[in-house]
Amino acid sequence: MFLENTVNHKEQFGWIEVICGSMFSGKTEELIRRLKRAQFAKQKVEIFKPSIDTRYDEEMVVSHNKNEIRSSPVPAAANIRILAQGCDVVGIDEAQFFDDEIVAVCNDLANSGIRVIVAGLDMDFKGNPFGPMPALMATAEYVTKVHAVCTRTGNLAHYSFRKNDNDKLVMLGETEEYEPLSRAAYFNAMRQNMEVKDAEHLSKDGK
């Protein structure tokens, strides 16, 4: 379990924590846990999420287990820098959907004495590093990688497999659209998809 750092008020610098993993791995759950601990300690906390994330609620950050905490939806990372002034702790959910400026924003906040907690997908559905997450993980003092359970093998899962043929990079969804898979299960699923597409192309060419 992650234990919060002890604040050195003489140093007057904060830090960055990143919580990453696949879908259904408990990223938002862990983010909410840390933020509520800070609220219980009477620290001033602000939470932000990208305004495109309206799956459960337009304003609340909600985990798959329905735990929730109030947030401020923002269209761009630059808004966070303005709205977070005077905070002790800043939480950011679904960080992979923000523009690249989120990295500079998080570092600016940490340099001004704020504890910054970021949660997001580390890989997209194609298995590639997702958006600004690699840079956030590189600059963070603490990185926590959480895992789901593979729906096909029961092993640890760290891939988010998309069940449909939609090729858009950003597609919000739940269990109907995605499932967490282990490396072996993901490799096999992607290979089967390629075989199906190849068969479809051959069928069309043969007509």
Q: Locations of the language-model features?
A:
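Catalytic-core regions built around general acid/base machinery
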Residues: 34, 104-112, 132-139
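Structural recognition of the conserved hydrophobic beta-strand(s) that form the central parallel beta-sheet
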Residues: 91, 114-122
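Conserved acidic residues
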Residues: 88, 140-141
